[in-house]
Regions:
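Vicinal oxygen chelate
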Residues: 2-3, 13-14, 23-27, 48, ...
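Short beta-strand/turn micro-motifs at beta-sheet edges
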Residues: 5-8, 75-81
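The feature marks the first
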Residues: 6, 14-21, 39-40
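Short, structured motif recognition centered on aromatic/hydrophobic residues
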Residues: 16, 39, 56, 66-69, ...
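Core segments of cupin and vicinal oxygen chelate
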Residues: 22-65, 119
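Short loop segments at secondary-structure junctions
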Residues: 60-63, 75, 95, 131
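Short, basic, helix/turn surface patches
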Residues: 67-73, 141-151
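A conserved beta-strand-loop-helix scaffold within acyl/acetyltransferase catalytic domains
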Residues: 73-74, 118
Length: 160
């Protein structure tokens, strides 16, 4: 077969579609993600790969990809350990420093323990845990990745 002279179409990822967490009790997850964080419970179904596991989808009002976090219920599983192959945290975007401060005050009023606002150079954030111990982050968009290097040089500076 003759090789094509055309360059193959460039493959581009469009961002995250969703993140799935393993939880012990979906009722606690509904209480937290819907009633505390304000996400819409978009879908209640079962895991396509294990129909014994309930699968809940939370997201924005339209359930758009990129806004969703899903929970698979496995009440019989033990708590996991942090290590290679595990995920450290999931970050949600908030619009501004003022919104981040508002979220922090609101979470504390709901007895959700969270960190002080942390300056991460490229954004500011607050960390908290969901009822199953997953680390969640609320993060601002700015000041952005170009705060210490120009756009055209992003990712070229050596680390360490």
């Amino acid at each position: 077969m003759e090789a094509s002279a055309q360059q193959p179409r460039r493959l581009v990822l469009g961002g995250l579609h969703h993140v799935t967490l393993i939880v012990k009790d979906v009722r606690r997850s509904v209480d937290f993600y819907r009633n505390v964080l304000g996400l819409r419970l978009v879908k209640q179904t079962v895991n396509e790969d294990d129909r014994s596991a309930r699968h809940l989808f939370f997201g924005d009002e339209e359930g758009r990809p990129g806004t969703m976090i899903t929970c698979l219920e496995y009440p019989q599983l033990d708590e996991g350990t942090v290590g290679v192959g595990s995920t450290h945290h999931v970050a949600f975007s908030v619009g501004s420093d003022e919104e981040l401060e508002g979220w922090r005050a609101y979470l504390e009023s709901r007895d959700v323990q969270c960190t002080e606002v942390l300056d991460r150079t490229y954004f500011r954030s607050v960390y908290l845990r969901d009822p199953d111990g997953h680390i969640l982050e609320l993060a601002t968009a700015g000041p952005g990745m170009t705060v210490d290097e120009p756009l055209e040089q992003l990712g070229q500076r050596a680390v360490g």
